[in-house]
A protein has these predicted regions:
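Short hydrophobic/aromatic-rich beta-strand segments that constitute the beta-sheet cores
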Residues: 59, 86-90, 108-112, 118-120, ...
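Gly/Pro-enriched, hydrophobic low-complexity segments
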Residues: 141, 163-256
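Generic beta-strand structural signal
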Residues: 80-81, 102-104, 111, 154, ...
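Sec/Tat signal peptide C-region and signal peptidase I cleavage site
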Residues: 32-38
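Bacterial N-terminal signal peptides that target proteins for export
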Residues: 4-23
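Bacterial N-terminal signal peptides
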Residues: 22-32
Length: 266
């Protein structure tokens, strides 16, 4: 009888241990999950854009377009004001010097100094490559579209250089005027964009933008390089590398006009 009672006690004790372990596991994973869900995904995206773009910026970059049998390098000066206004002018090579692009909101204009002509890009041209690169005109003109036209969900986390990274799934809002069927974004806890993947309406990966070589730049941690890579095409990509970058509190409104597009301030 004593052996039987001992057996019952041991069995009940093991059951109690298992129940406690199960309860602890549920609580542990609930805490982890609630920690992820407690973060507002839209706030993360907005903070990421605010950090990356700042109030205003002036930069000089080298843009290298790489193809299997050729390579082109442009030196570009850029001015940005918030998420809506940008001005780009080509400094080199000499034959392309003075070519420019102006972005105001979702509208874009290009300037060709050889014919002294400004052209406003129609919607049908917005999906075309910008300067023959892997960045489209849409990529430049709709920098704030990710904030306004998509709904965001945190789907996981990972670690990058000992810092937490939030993985965010962004899907278009109903009737949103967007090209992509989904975007998958990785934003670090210190507001740095790490990766942005673009999917078509069939949820097939089209291209991925990676932000690399994070270092002190422009007075704060910043990715020195951005690499836009086409899916399943290792030899087709575009690298944008910052040479000069400064962040400003403001830039004159006159910087972002058709007049400045033709005659940018150097």
């Amino acid at each position: 009888m004593n052996n039987f009672n001992n057996f019952l006690k041991k069995t009940n004790f093991n059951k109690l241990k298992n129940l406690k372990f199960l309860a602890f596991s549920v609580l542990f994973f609930s805490v982890i999950q609630s920690g992820v869900m407690a973060k507002d995904p839209l706030a993360l995206v907005v903070s990421g854009f605010d950090y990356m773009r700042d109030k205003a910026s002036v930069s000089v970059v080298d843009m290298t377009i790489h193809r299997p049998d050729w390579k082109r390098v442009f030196t570009i000066k850029a001015w940005t004001l918030g998420n809506k206004n940008s001005l780009f002018t080509i400094l080199a090579p000499a034959k392309d010097n003075g070519n420019g692009t102006l972005k105001k909101g979702k509208e874009m204009w290009i300037y060709n100094p050889k014919v002294n002509r400004v052209i406003k890009l129609p919607p049908s041209m917005m999906s075309q490559a910008w300067m023959g690169s892997d960045f489209s005109n849409n990529d430049l003109s709709k920098s704030d579209s990710l904030i306004n036209d998509y709904s965001h969900t945190i789907v996981g986390t990972e670690v990058h250089e000992k810092k937490k990274v939030y993985i965010i799934k962004s899907v278009p809002k109903p009737q949103a005027p967007v090209v992509w069927g989904m975007q998958r974004i990785k934003i670090r806890e210190d507001n740095l964009f790490i990766e942005q993947a673009f999917y078509d309406e069939e949820m097939k990966l089209v291209k991925t933008l990676k932000f690399t070589d994070i270092q002190m730049f422009g007075g704060k941690l910043y990715p020195k390089k951005m690499i836009m890579q086409k899916a399943n095409e290792k030899d087709k990509y575009t690298i944008v590398e910052y040479k000069i970058l400064s962040f400003e509190n403001n830039l004159p409104a006159g910087m972002f006009t058709l007049s400045s597009l033709k005659n940018p301030r150097r």
